[in-house]
From Swiss-Prot:
EC id: 5.3.1.26
Source organism of the structure: Streptococcus agalactiae serotype V (strain ATCC BAA-611 / 2603 V/R)
Annotated metabolic or biological route of this protein: Carbohydrate metabolism; D-galactose 6-phosphate degradation; D-tagatose 6-phosphate from D-galactose 6-phosphate: step 1/1
Domain of life: Bacteria
Family label: Belongs to the LacAB/RpiB family.
Protein name in UniProt: Galactose-6-phosphate isomerase subunit LacA
Amino acid sequence: MTIIIGADAHGVELKEVIRQHLTSLGKEIIDLTDTSKDFVDNTLAIVAKVNQKEDNLGIMVDAYGVGPFMVATKVKGMIAAEVSDERSAYMTRAHNNARMITLGSEIVGPGVAKHIVEGFVDGTYDAGRHQIRVDMLNKMC
């Protein structure tokens, strides 16, 4: 698994905390951050890289997390979630097979962000009854 991360200028500090934390856990990270670009371009770069390989995951950080979420969900094949708590991050992997999360640096502090990304990257898709919804989501774009 490779985790593709990025941020705009508003999320770069929290992204760096996340990058260092995941690296300390032995995770393979690719950082696509370009602070000269806004959240739309950074998010699209992450989505493109995540969609290249089935087991890639993505994390995008900006000020509030909502904009990158909206961008990511416009791309065919991407299931993303905007999260601000650990349980939602874990459950979006387990029930929705989300491959990307977005976070807001104005919403989530460093400690919670570390727990969020751990829950997300360590979560596994349960499939079963949840596959019906995932199939529905994948047909939408």
